[in-house]
């Protein structure tokens, strides 16, 4: 029923948890790992889980698009390599597939994998952003029918902001926020700070809306 598509680049530290959250699910009939020239154990982990391994130029947009072209199922689940879906996510996802129009897409609930109070505060801000502006994080995954995805033109080969780009094309009225959690690694927030990293994300978003080149935004993001 669903092809799961995971873009990777040196993701050995988190990929196993992501694959475990999908492996054995009755809804997931295909897992595609699209790798951007990893030099660690990423490819071996993918193969050990029986995932279909394909390769693409580095860049999340390019890698997601390449994975989608390999998908054989009618539904696509795009998921970052540092994000795992909580147990039981299938029930809500199946309900979405069965009861919402085919021209709809769904995202999961942003959750970080640590108990620090700033992590909870950030989760609340992300939910508020989704409620007010219908702009979820890419970390929340994306469940969409292959037909609707193709009608939208799919992910574009841009180095950053590919998630915002496709969400804007989906549109607020076609987007469903599920309650099931997408549990994301908090490593980058621990490394860069729970204030600096979100502010940097916001700056990137504002630059994108003002028409700044995604290539420049990527340099700033780094």
Show where each model-derived region lies:
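Cell-envelope/extracellular polymer assembly enzymes that use nucleotide-activated donors
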Residues: 1-3, 30, 165
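Short, well-formed alpha-helical segments that are part of the catalytic scaffolds
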Residues: 5-24
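Acidic helix N-cap motif at the loop->helix transition within catalytic regions
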Residues: 13-17, 40-49
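Conserved donor nucleotide-binding strand/loop of the catalytic core
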Residues: 29, 43-70
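A conserved acidic beta->alpha catalytic loop
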Residues: 35-43, 83
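Short aromatic/hydrophobic "clamp" motif used to bind/position activated sugar donors
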Residues: 76
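Conserved donor NDP-sugar-binding/catalytic core segment of glycosyltransferases
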Residues: 88-118
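Hydrophobic helical membrane-anchoring modules
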Residues: 168-222
């Amino acid at each position: 029923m669903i092809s799961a598509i995971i873009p990777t680049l040196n993701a050995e530290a988190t990929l196993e948890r992501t694959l475990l959250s999908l492996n054995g699910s009755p809804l997931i009939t295909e897992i595609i790992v699209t790798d951007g020239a990893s030099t660690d154990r990423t490819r071996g982990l993918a193969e050990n889980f029986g995932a279909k391994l394909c390769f693409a130029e580095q860049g999340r947009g390019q890698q997601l698009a390449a994975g989608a072209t390999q998908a054989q199922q009618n539904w696509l689940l795009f998921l970052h390599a540092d994000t795992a879906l909580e147990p039981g996510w299938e029930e809500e996802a199946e309900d979405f597939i069965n009861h919402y129009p085919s021209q709809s897409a769904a995202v999961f609930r942003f959750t970080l994998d640590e108990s620090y109070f700033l992590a909870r505060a950030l989760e609340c801000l992300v939910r508020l952003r989704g409620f007010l502006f219908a702009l979820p994080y890419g970390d929340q995954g994306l469940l969409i029918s292959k037909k609707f995805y193709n009608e939208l033109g799919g992910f574009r080969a841009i180095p950053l902001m590919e998630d915002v780009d496709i969400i804007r094309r989906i549109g607020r009225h076609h987007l469903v926020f599920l309650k099931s959690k997408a549990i994301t690694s908090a490593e980058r927030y621990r490394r860069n700070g729970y204030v600096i990293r979100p502010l940097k994300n916001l700056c990137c978003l504002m630059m994108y809306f003002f028409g700044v080149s995604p290539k420049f935004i990527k340099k700033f993001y780094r």
